[in-house]
Structures are given as C-alpha cells and as structure tokens.
Regions:
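Short, charged low-complexity linear segments at domain edges
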Residues: 350-381
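Helicase motor core with emphasis on the C-terminal RecA-like subdomain
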Residues: 2-13, 17-21, 25-47, 55-57, ...
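Accessory DNA-binding and partner-docking regions appended to nucleic-acid-acting proteins
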Residues: 1-9, 353-354, 382-595
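Generic alpha-helical structural context detector
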Residues: 28, 185, 313, 328-332, ...
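Short helix-to-turn junction characteristic of helix-turn-helix DNA-binding domains
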Residues: 30, 222, 273, 365, ...
Length: 595
C-alpha cells in the first residue's frame, strides 16, 4: 500500500489532506517493508511517519525512544488521535496489562526505552507477537560520532536482527555526515535507505550577541517574545539566578530546572511548562529533549552550547508548530576558555573531534555572514548566501580588518607576562596608568598607549574574537595568555577580520520580527481566538493533557478566521481528525456560534 493510498486515513486520523515535505517518501518505504533512516528537521512531522503506518499495518509498531517524558507526551497525542498506544517504562504501573494487550493484538503503538528493549523479557514478548515495524527515535544516540551517544542504543542491533523481516525506521533531526553513516551501519540500514529531508527551520530567527549584561539582555529579549520559552544556562546556579531575575523583571511565571532538583520537583516543572501557554523554564541542557511541546516561541542560550549539533537541537525546540520563533545566544570569551579546559581533560582519541566541533561554534558566533547558511553548511547542505531571517541578514554589520590591532593586543599580553585580565591589557594599550600598572612598570612598556580613538572600542570585542580563534587562552586565575594561533597572527601570517560592534544595539535583542508576523502567530486581542483558547484550556484540564494535544494554535486561528458552523465544515480544517472532532468538535462550535 502506497502513501497516497493512505491519504483518507491521514485525513480521518490526523485531519491533514496531504503529507508535508518528504513524509510520503518515508511512509512509502515503511509500507513497502524497507529499512530507512529519515533525517528530518524538528517540526517536520517525524512521528507521523510511524504513527500513520501504525494505524494502517496489521500488528503493533514498536517505538524505541530515549526519554520517558517524551514517550508519555507522544503517547497522549497518539491516544487523542484515536491510536491505541501504550508504553513500557520504569514509571508505568500497568506493565502486565500492557504486555497482555500487546499479546492480544490490542495495540497499534508500543513505546519502550532502549534499556527495556534490549532485555530478554522484551524479546520474548515480541516473539509472541511479531511487531509490524521497529521505529528508532533519536537515532543519533546510536553513534559515537553523535552529540548524544547512548551505549544502550548500540545494544539494539541484536534485537532488530532477531526479526529480520520486520522493517526498520530510524529517525533523527540532528546528524552530520559522519553520524548518518554510522547510524546506517549500526542499525543495519542500506545506504539507499537514507532520506535526507534537510535541516532548515525557516520559521526560527537566529541571533547571536556578545554577553555583556546577560540578565538585562535576556529580559529585553523575553519582553519582546510572548509565549512559552526556554532559557539554557551553563550551570545549576545560573538557572536559579536567572529564574529569579527574569521573574522579577517580567512578572511572568519562571521555573528553574536542573539535575540537582529532586525528581518530583523536576517532573512538576516539566508538567507545568508543557501545560502552560506562556511559562518560561531556565534550565541546563538536560531539559527539553523529553519535551513534545510544539508551541515554544523562543529558546535563549545564556552561554555557549556544547556543539553546533547541540545548538541546532536545542534551538529546534522552538517553533515546532511552524509559527515564527526566536533563538538567541549570548556568548563570552570565558565560554571558550572553559571549553578548551574541558578539551584538555578528554581522552586523546576524542580531542581532535571535539576541537573541530568547538571551532565550528567559534565560526558561528564570529561570522558576519548569514548564520543560517553557516549552520546548514555544517550539515552538508548548500543554502543561499542570505536567509533574510537571522541577525546578520536583518542588521548587516561592517567587517573591519583588525590584524594590526590583534598584533598590538597579543604583544601587550606577552609583554605584561601573560597573567593579567582583559581590563588590565586594555588600560595598558590605551595608556591609562594606575597604581597597579605603574607598580609593575607596565607604563614603561613599548605597548603602553599605542591604541587610541576608534581602535580602543574594538579591544574587548577583539579579545572575545581571539579567544574563539585560539589566539588567546586564560590562565587558571583568569589572566590572558597566548594560545596556539597567536604566533601566526603576531608574525602577520594570519589576517584578523571581525564584525565592527554597533555603537548602540537596539533594545530588541532577538532581531526584528515584524509585528504582523507576531500578530499572525498569536492574535491576542481577537475575542474569538481568545475564547477558543479558553475553551481549549478547559477541555485540556478535563482530559488531563496539555492544551496543544487538543488543537494547535494554528487550528484555532483557522477556526477564528473561517468560523465553521457545522461539524463537516470544522472537519475540513487541517488538524481536525475524526477522533478529535467527535470528542471536542461541538464544544468549539458552540464557542464560535456565540460570536
């Protein structure tokens, strides 16, 4: 059965008239019994490529997923669409009931964690009733090349090979060329089984800023972005501190999330965020991977992510519903200093690969070109030179040649003994003497007072730039020291080009999303839209599910604009499937009739 033959089922189950992107190709291969690796951007509808076959195929689709919270979120969504779904996790109390339902053929979907899937007991269960499909979600976890390697994923192959006739579908949003090749090998998928749907998330606006006053920068960014959001901080203390500062400045609901909280508290923060329409979580990177929340409107990083892959995945948690979303990163020279210190602690075999990842991040934060283009080229794509939806495209900066200034700065670091901070070096270069400088004789050095005028404004940004380029590093006490790339710069063998810092950055930290775009995404002030959202909240509370499980905002916007008066008219709206129409259609029609 082809994907096209499943279009009526797609409409009746999920409320969609057609497939998106390359969904139909993936479904075609699944229905033909092929083995497939689908690399699709977050928000492109990866889960539909196994949920629709789960309804169409005879037998149960077994989904391997790494996070319990993610499984349970997807479970709620599947059940709301009328799919018979269950999970076997450490927090599920109904194991016996679920296993019996599987044996009796009463399940369409069974979610399981990799550590459960690789146990002998689970294989015995599958031998009693052969599954219709293995779907391996977050498949990059199987690869040591990937940014989130999990050893349990490596143990899946024997289970898959025990059922060679069962098709395999591996899914990921984040895999560079090396990782993709490794996934194919590790999961026994042929090279022609790769479907690469691309990595672009055109609805996300990317911005990168030097970290100057992080709390204020984040507050300004959040003030311009209504709706739910995630702020990533490098440390547990940072999440707590930012939560307090953002809540005090904005009056919004903000909760911290990190591994130091007890499990009950973490579960509560996650539950409240998923159910909210405007909540904010400040978190370490542990948060978000287990979240299936499509209406996150922004993601901010208060520090440097671990890698380009991590950045792509974390920012990809915004705008999964297709509406406009924002991603902003704040970075500082100390981020690179800490990252390089961590490099020195790694096994030798991993250092080269991690250095490549760090240098890719340096290129992202340093570039004056299109950030989206750089990001997509990292994943092997050939994007246009300009995207029109990142800070560098919207607010182009001038590139300046800072080669000579870099030589002066590096010379000052060297001549002062490679142990003083950026403020001290700046004072020496600009000829500002004080007791500390005079007592060390630094006012007598040849580099004292050799920088003036416009050059002086570039010193601090240049320190950040040289840290990112490995020309500067820091001592254990925070002083500046020369890095491995310094020698070539000091000899004039390497040119140093950098973005000229703006005289005054607009208060809007995330770019310039048009008011029209934002109003279209979230038309607050439309009485009917507000009433439909209120009804959604009420129904979600009754059903014990997050509001987006009822209907996405896009569906409510279409209801508000089209004002359907009958069930059949409501069923024509994309996203209104048969089960949801039956369960909640009349409630929304009653709201519409009041306007």
């Amino acid at each position: 059965m082809s994907a096209d033959a499943l279009l009526p089922l797609l409409k009746s189950t999920f409320g969609f008239d057609h497939f998106r992107g390359r969904q139909s190709e993936v479904v075609d291969r699944v229905m033909a019994g092929e083995r497939t690796l689908a690399v699709m951007p977050t928000g492109a509808g990866k889960s539909l490529t196994y949920q629709l076959p789960a309804v169409a195929l005879n037998g149960c689709v077994v989904v391997v997923s790494p996070l319990i919270a993610l499984m349970h979120d997807q479970l709620r969504g599947a059940r709301a669409a009328g799919i018979r779904a269950a999970s076997l996790t450490s927090v599920d109390a109904d194991w016996a009931e679920t296993r019996q339902a599987y044996r009796d053929g009463q399940l369409d979907l069974l979610y399981v964690a990799p550590e459960r899937a690789t146990g002998e007991g689970f294989r015995s269960l599958l031998e009693a009733q052969t599954p219709a499909l293995f779907a391996i979600d977050e498949a990059h976890c199987v690869s040591e090349w990937g940014h989130d390697f999990r050893p349990d994923y490596r143990l899946l192959r024997p289970l898959l090979d025990a059922f060679p006739e069962v098709p395999r579908l591996a899914l990921t949003a984040t895999a560079d060329k090396h990782t993709r090749e490794d996934i194919l090998v590790q999961l026994g998928i042929p090279g022609d089984g790769l479907i690469l749907a691309g990595f672009d998330r055109p609805n996300i606006r990317y911005a990168v800023r030097p970290r100057i006053s992080p709390a204020k920068q984040l507050v300004d960014f959040i003030a311009a972005n209504p709706g739910p959001g995630i702020v990533y901080a490098p440390t547990r203390n940072g999440t707590e501190r930012l939560a307090e500062q953002i809540a005090a400045a904005t009056g919004r609901s903000v909760a911290a999330y990190h591994a130091g909280l007890d499990p009950e508290r973490r579960a509560r923060v996650q539950h409240d965020f998923v159910a909210s329409e405007d909540g904010i979580v400040t978190a370490t990177v542990a948060f978000g991977m287990g979240i299936d929340k499509p209406d996150v409107r922004f993601v901010a990083h208060a520090g440097l992510p671990k890698s380009i892959e991590s950045y792509y995945q974390e920012t990809g948690r915004a705008g999964r519903d297709g509406d406009p979303a924002e991603a902003m990163m704040l970075w500082g020279a100390d981020d690179f200093a800490r990252a390089r210190m961590r490099l020195s602690e790694l096994p030798e075999a991993r250092v080269a690969g991690e250095r490549v990842r760090l240098n890719a991040l340096a290129a992202l934060v340093e570039t004056v070109e299109c950030r989206r283009a750089l990001l997509l080229r990292h994943f092997g794509e050939n994007p246009p030179e300009r995207c029109g939806n990142c800070d560098n495209c919207l607010e182009p900066g001038r590139q300046v040649d800072a080669t000579v200034l870099a030589q002066k700065l590096l010379s000052a670091v060297y001549r002062t003994g490679q142990s003083f901070g950026a403020g001290h070096i700046e004072a020496v270069l600009c000829g500002r003497s004080d007791e500390r400088i005079a007592s060390r004789g630094h006012d007598k050095l040849s580099v004292f007072g050799i920088v003036a005028g416009e050059e002086a404004r570039l010193i601090k940004p240049l320190v950040r730039s040289l840290m990112a380029r490995e020309a500067l590093d820091t001592t254990e006490h925070g002083g500046l020291m020369l890095g491995p790339a310094a020698r070539a710069m000091m000899k004039g063998e390497t040119a140093v080009l950098m973005a000229e810092p703006p005289v005054k950055r607009t208060q809007r930290e995330g770019g310039r999303t048009s008011r029209a775009d934002r109003a279209a995404a979230n038309p607050v002030g439309d009485p009917l839209f507000d009433a439909l959202r209120a009804m959604r909240r009420e129904l979600a509370a009754e059903a014990g599910v997050p509001p987006y499980v009822i209907f996405h905002d896009a569906v409510l916007r279409t209801m508000a604009s089209q004002r359907p008066a009958t069930r059949s008219a409501l069923a024509d709206i994309p996203g209104v499937g048969g089960k949801k129409l039956e369960a909640w259609g009349d409630a929304f029609l009653n709201v519409i009739r009041q306007f």
